[in-house]
Amino acid sequence: MDARKEGLLRKPRFSAQPRVGMGLLPFFLACAVYLLVRNADQPPWVNVLLKILPVLYLAGFLGTAHPGGGYRALLQGALLCSAVGDACLVWPEALRYGMAAFGLAHLLYLRAFGLTPLKPGLLLPLLLVSALYFRVLHPHMPPQVVWPLLAYSIVLVAMLWRGLARGGSAHWGALLFVLSDSVLAWNIFTYLVPHGHLLVMTTYYSAQMLITLSAFQNPRLKSH
């Protein structure tokens, strides 16, 4: 196999679908509106609507991906679950419901990313780093969220493992999702990171966009 063919195996390419970039302009606009207009003094339903619009747009945008199939449907389901989680997190008392919704979203992403290639060597380092971070946060957590957050963390790490193994934009989307959740957990359970909300939301929206874009990439060729 020559180097050019080998490169095709390693590097997923975006399908030749027109105006994918232009199709994301409403998403970027919705993100900007939320970040600029969001205000704690507004009625909660206004902030909920502004917050979930970018993610709902991505779910609709996935309808333009060809071919469609199960991968696209799983991503759309994950985005809809994420929108429910986003809405729940507007109210601090609904944190556990938000974790449940996002946990389901990650299970759908996990199913979409699949188990091929397996790359088991990635899993242990990810589990170790996650366990260390959880141990740092643990003394600051209310007792009622310890077990739900532990379960959520395991699902999140599994999603990251499969996203990294899949490669392409899903790789970077999974990484940014974990970064966003890590900063959010620090903000909630320890102390506020400077500009923490901006960091959480920009990494979160970027993560969802990159995972969405993985549906527009050509399937990777496999060698036998």
Curated annotation (Swiss-Prot):
It comes from the Eukaryota. The lineage of its organism: Eukaryota, Metazoa, Chordata, Craniata, Vertebrata. Competitively inhibited by lysophosphatidic acid. The gene is TMEM86B. It catalyses: a 1-O-(1Z-alkenyl)-sn-glycero-3-phosphocholine + H2O = a 2,3-saturated aldehyde + sn-glycerol 3-phosphocholine; a 1-O-(1Z-alkenyl)-sn-glycero-3-phosphoethanolamine + H2O = a 2,3-saturated aldehyde + sn-glycero-3-phosphoethanolamine. Keywords: Cytoplasm, Endoplasmic reticulum, Hydrolase, Lipid metabolism, Membrane, Transmembrane, Transmembrane helix. This is Lysoplasmalogenase TMEM86B. The chain crosses the membrane at residues 20-37, 45-65, 73-91, 98-114, 121-137, 145-161, 172-189, 198-216. Residues 38-44, 92-97, 138-144, 190-197 are extracellular. Pfam families: YhhN (PF07947). It is an enzyme of class 3 (hydrolase).
